[in-house]
Design a protein with these regions (language model features):
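Fe(II)/2-oxoglutarate oxygenase catalytic core
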Residues: 1-162, 168-194
Length: 194
């Protein structure tokens, strides 16, 4: 299935300013660190082709319940809706999944992957927009760059800044070579592609 909507203005959008202050980032970090951590899986987790694969991904994650940080969810969804209206143009977009707190230690990475099932076998709602928000101060780690396979885009985010991109774009987090990288990952979905 090829996505046919909409006529694109852009596939990738960075916020011009941070969405969260350093204090707000620390609140999200504290929440993420307090929750049950799990070794991150690849390829739809427990589904065929999925599971834990240290050749493709080394990081721990935790899931932040909606009820624990409603203001965070409200602010990020509002920003996504603006980005969708100004750039993506999808119909019926909404927050559909809880946020993933990701914690990359030195040596942690996530190889090239997509965030949606382009064949639509496991959905709706269909993931259409992915977001990464950098929680760490970039001065506290080296490496860990987010690369998106679209015009060789490398995101150089400030603390609290977010990037939104089409969920079917291949992307990766390069290995962290020093320090720790903490980020918030979210997905937004809607009805199946037309």
């Amino acid at each position: 299935m090829n996505p046919t909507e909409p006529i694109w203005k852009s596939y990738i959008v960075e916020t011009t300013q941070p969405i969260f202050t350093p204090k707000q980032c620390q609140m999200v970090i504290d929440k993420g660190m307090s929750l049950k951590k799990e070794t991150a899986a690849v390829g739809m987790g427990q589904r065929p082709g999925g599971g834990i694969d240290p050749k493709k991904r080394i990081t721990t994650i935790s899931w932040i319940p909606f009820k624990d940080m409603p203001e965070m969810y409200r602010d990020i969804e509002a920003t996504m809706l603006k980005a969708n209206g100004n750039h993506f143009g999808f119909e019926g977009m909404r927050l559909t999944e809880v946020a993933q707190f990701t914690h990359y230690l030195t040596g942690g990475f996530y190889d090239w992957h997509m965030d949606n099932d382009v064949l639509g076998k496991h959905e709706p709602p269909v993931r259409k927009i992915s977001m990464t928000l950098l929680l760490s101060d970039p001065a506290t780690f080296e490496g860990g760059e987010l690369e998106i396979m679209s015009k060789d885009k490398t995101a150089k985010l400030k603390q609290g800044q977010a990037i939104f991109f089409a969920s079917w774009l291949q992307h990766r987090v390069k290995p962290v070579t020093k320090g720790e990288r903490k980020s918030l990952v979210m997905w937004f979905g809607g009805p199946s592609f037309k």
